[in-house]
Amino acid sequence: MSRFDYRNTSKNTSVVDPDHSSPIINYRKDAKKGIKFTFMVVGESGTGKTTFINSLLNKKVLNHRYEKLSPTVGDTKTLMFTSAKSVALPNTSILTKNEFNPRTINEEPGIALTETHIEIIDDDNQKLLLNIIDTPGFGENLNNELCFIEIENYLKQQFDLVLAEETRIKRNPRFVDTRVHVMLYFITPTGHGLREIDIQCMKRLSKYVNIIPVIGKADSFTLNELQHFKQQIRIDIQKFNVPTFQFDNSLNDYDEDEDYDLIQECKFLTNLQPFAVVTSEDVFEVRESTTSTKGNNDKPKIIRARKYPWGLVDINDTRYSDFPILKSVLLGSHLQDLKDLTHDFLYETYRTERLTKVTGNGQAFDDEENEDAEFHDTVEHQLNDSNRGVGGDDNNNNNNNNNNASTIPSMSNLAQLTTSTNEHDASHIDNNSITSTSSSIKKSTSMLIDDHPSSSPKLKNISSFTSSTSTVSLEGGEKEGGHHDRGANSTSTNNNNNNNAFKRLSIGPQRNQLRQISETVPYVLRHERILERQQKLEEMEQASARELANRAALLEKKAAQLKAKEKALRQLELNRQKQEESATSSLHRKDSDISGSVQSGGVDDGKSESTNNNNNNRNGYGYGHGHGHGQSHEYDNSEYHHDDSTPNYETSRLQKDETLTDLHSIVSNH
C-alpha cells in the first residue's frame, strides 16, 4: 500500500508512516480551515483608514463617513458602542451617518468598535480569513480617555476568553480565537511629530497588541517634509519610550551567511518605520511603453492611483508610497511573526499576571523552586505524622522513629526513611487528605491516581517516584542496615506502597492545583466580566437618569418661562383694552360737549335774527317789498333752521352772515 493511500488506515494503522502523513494531513486541514488573522485600525477621522482598507483588499469593504450606503463585500457588525455621555441608545443603527447634519455636529460621538470579516484566496489556493476591527469616533471627543478604556477592555476581553478556554477541563473544539494580532495606528499628518493622544494611546495598548505606526495621506508632503516628519516621529517614540513592533528583534536568531537577505530586509523595515502610505480607490488604465525588437508597443496597465491636475500618483510606486511594503508585511512576510509574538509574549505575559491575581498568590505557578520546596515540606510532614502514629513495645523502633522524626528528609536518607516507615504507610496512604506544612491547608489526594496500589512488573525490584524537578530510584534488593528476615515478597509490596505514596505526595498537590485552576479561572473570569458589564450598565443607568433629570429640569424651566411670557402677554392685552376703553370714553365725552355747545349757539342766533326782523318791519318797509323779501327771507330762514340742525357751528355762523349780507343788499337796493 502506498504511503499516500489513506484507505483502510483504521484497520492497519501500522502501515502508514506518521512522519510522512502528518504534514500532508495538517496542510490539508490548514488549507481547508484557512489562516486567521486579525488587525485593528485606530486613528482620528480623516486620516485615511477606510481608504487604506479598501486599497489593501482591492475591493469595497467599508463605506466612508457621510457616504450613501453602497454594496460591500464584507459583513460588518457593531461589537460595542459607548456614548460620550454614557447614555444607552435604543439601537446602533443611528451610528451610521450617511448625511451631514449641522444640528448634531457639535455632539460628542463616543467610541464604537466594528468588525468586518473578509475571505481571501491567493494564487496558491490558500485561504486567508481576515478580521478587521475599526474604531469610529476615536479622537473626536472632548475627553478621549473613554476611547482608550474601551479599546483596552476589548483587547483584554479577547485574552480572557482564550485563557478561560485553555484552563477548562473540557475544551470547546469550535472555539474561535479573536485576539488582535496587530494594530495599525494612523498618525494625523501634521508634520510636527506625535501628539499627546498618540503617545498615550500607543503606550497604553502596547501591552496587549503589536503596534505599527502609519502616516496616512503621505502625498500631502514633499519628500523633504516627509523625511523630516518621520525623523520627528522616531525621536518622539524613543524619547517617550513608546513600544512599537520591532522588525530587528530576532536578528540574533539568524545566521549571517545563510539568512543574509532576511537580516537586510529586517534592517530595511526598521529604518523605514513609520510607514508613509498613499492610498486610493480609483482605478485607471495607463499605457506602459515597452521596447522590443519589432518596435515600441504600448501595453495597457490597470493601476490604483490618485489623480491630480498635473498627473497620476501610483499608490504601488515605492518612490512615493510605502503601501506595497506594508501590504507585504501584513499579508505575507511577517504575518506569522505577528501571530507568534502575540501568543508567545503578549498573551503569556498577560496570562501570568492574570493567573497570579485570580489565584491570590503572589508568585507564579511555574516557579520550580517553590514547587520543590512545597514537595519537601509535604514529605516531611507526612513522615512525621506516620512516625507519631507508630505504636509498639520495641524501644529500638521508638528510638528510630524519634530520630527519623527529627531528621529532615533529603535525597541521601530518603531510602532509610522509607524503609523504617513501610509498615504504617498503607494506613496513612488511605487517608482522604494530605496536610502541607507550608500552607497549612488540607488538600485532597489526586483524583488522577488510584488510591488502591496495584503491582506493576516494572516495579518488582525497583521503586521510583517522579517529581517536577527530580527523579529518585530506590533499589528494593540489598540495603545497608536492613532486615533480611522479612522476605522478598513483603519488601516488594512495601516498596510499591511507598512508591504510590510518594507519587501522591509529589504529583497530588500539583494535580490538585491545576484542577483548582481549571475549575476556578473560567468562572472567575466570567464573573469579572459580568461585574464589569453590570458596573457599566449601572453607570449608563445613572448617566441616563442624570440626563433625563437635566432634560426634565430644562423642560420645566422652559415651561415656567412660557407661563411667565403668557402672563405678561395677558397683562399687556388687558392694559391695551383699558387704554382703548378710556380713549373711547374720552371721545364720547368730547362729542357730547361739542354737540351741546352747538345747540346752545343755534338758539341764540335764532333769537337775534327774529329781533332784527321785527326791527326792520318797524322801520316802515313796504308790505309788497316786505312780502316779497319776506318770502325769500322765509326761504333763507328755513334753510338756516335746516342747517342749524347740523352740529357744525362754523357752517351755521357762515349761513347767518350770508343772511345778514342779503338783508343789507336788499336795503341798499331800495
Curated annotation (Swiss-Prot):
A Pfam family that the UniProt record links to this protein: Septin
Annotated gene: SEP7
Renumbered residue ranges of the record's region G3 motif: 134-137
Skewed-composition ranges (Polar residues): 405-421
Protein name (Swiss-Prot/TrEMBL): Septation protein 7
Compositional bias ranges of the Low complexity kind: 395-404, 433-446, 463-473, 489-500
Changes after translation: Phosphorylated by GIN4 which stabilizes the GIN4-SEP7 interaction.
Species, as recorded: Candida albicans (strain SC5314 / ATCC MYA-2876) (Yeast)
G1 motif as annotated region, ranges: 43-50
Assembly: Component of the septin complex which consists of CDC3, CDC10, CDC11, CDC12 and probably SEP7. The purified septin complex appeared to have a stoichiometry of 2 CDC3, 1 to 2 CDC10, 1 CDC11, 2 CDC12, and 1 or none SEP7 subunit. Induction of hyphal growth brings about important modifications in septin ring dynamics, because the rings were found in a different state from those of yeast cells. This hyphal-specific state contains a core of stable septins (SEP7, CDC3, and CDC12), and it shows a high CDC10 turnover between the ring and the cytoplasm. Interacts with GIN4.
Cellular component GO terms held in the UniProt record: cell division site; cell septum; cellular bud neck; cytosol; Gin4 complex; microtubule cytoskeleton; septin complex; septin ring
Location of this chain's protein in the cell: Bud neck
Biological process, per Gene Ontology: actomyosin contractile ring assembly; cellular bud neck septin ring organization; cytoskeleton-dependent cytokinesis; division septum assembly; endoplasmic reticulum polarization; exit from mitosis; G1/S transition of mitotic cell cycle; hyphal growth
The keyword Nucleotide-binding is assigned to this record: yes
Every Septin-type G domain range: 33-357
Region ranges (Disordered): 383-513, 574-670
Similarity comment text for this entry: Belongs to the TRAFAC class TrmE-Era-EngA-EngB-Septin-like GTPase superfamily. Septin GTPase family.
InterPro entries for this protein: G_SEPTIN_dom, P-loop_NTPase, Septin, Sigma_54_int_dom_ATP-bd_1
